[in-house]
Regions:
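General helical secondary-structure elements
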Residues: 5, 12-13, 57, 67-69
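Short, extreme N-terminal segment that most often corresponds to the first beta-strand
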Residues: 5-7, 12-38, 157-159
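Charged, amphipathic alpha-helical linkers/stalks
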Residues: 41-60
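Low-complexity intrinsically disordered segments
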Residues: 58-160
Length: 160
């Protein structure tokens, strides 16, 4: 890994100091987490959501999906969202995701949503995440001076 990073650094051209620049035909992703969460994810005990970088258990995953369904169902009108006759400013759409509204989302609605959703927005198993992205993937672990092991993972490649 150090050889590849050295080659990469040596071939970089400085355009603006302190800014990482890339051409628009490539894509990059990096996520850092503790090793125990990463291992639980790889073992199917947790789900990872690319959208917010959080890990979830099964219950948390279902809640994220239900919130996404409510956000999708809410009607946008002139800077506000309306759902079940409740109006909230667009920045406060999560106020529509009450426990009552979440509990009304059916299994059928969840299944329909999952058929057409953007996988970036829902928590995925490691296998689902790995299958979803057609880029090169990586995972690297590092142990800090205090003994904590951190894992960096993600994907990269051209977006042709």
């Amino acid at each position: 890994m150090k050889i590849a990073l050295t080659e990469w650094r040596d071939n970089m051209k400085l355009i603006r100091r302190g800014t990482f620049e890339t051409n628009s035909s490539s894509t990059h992703s990096i996520t850092m987490c503790n090793k125990s969460d990463f291992d639980k994810w790889k073992n199917g005990e947790l789900y990872y959501c690319q959208d917010n970088g959080n890990f979830y258990n099964e219950e948390g995953r279902e809640k994220v999906i239900k919130k996404n369904i409510i956000r999708e169902k809410a009607k946008y009108d002139n800077g506000n969202y309306i759902y079940k006759n409740v109006i909230v400013p667009y920045k406060e759409i999560d106020k529509l995701c009450t426990e009552e509204n979440l509990s009304e989302i059916t299994k059928e609605e969840i299944e329909t949503y999952l058929e057409d959703c953007d996988y970036y927005e829902i928590p995925l198993t490691y296998e689902e995440w790995d299958d979803q992205f057609e880029y090169e993937k990586y995972e690297v672990s590092y142990t800090t001076n205090s003994g904590e092991t951190v894992v960096a993972f993600g994907y990269y490649g051209t977006d042709y």
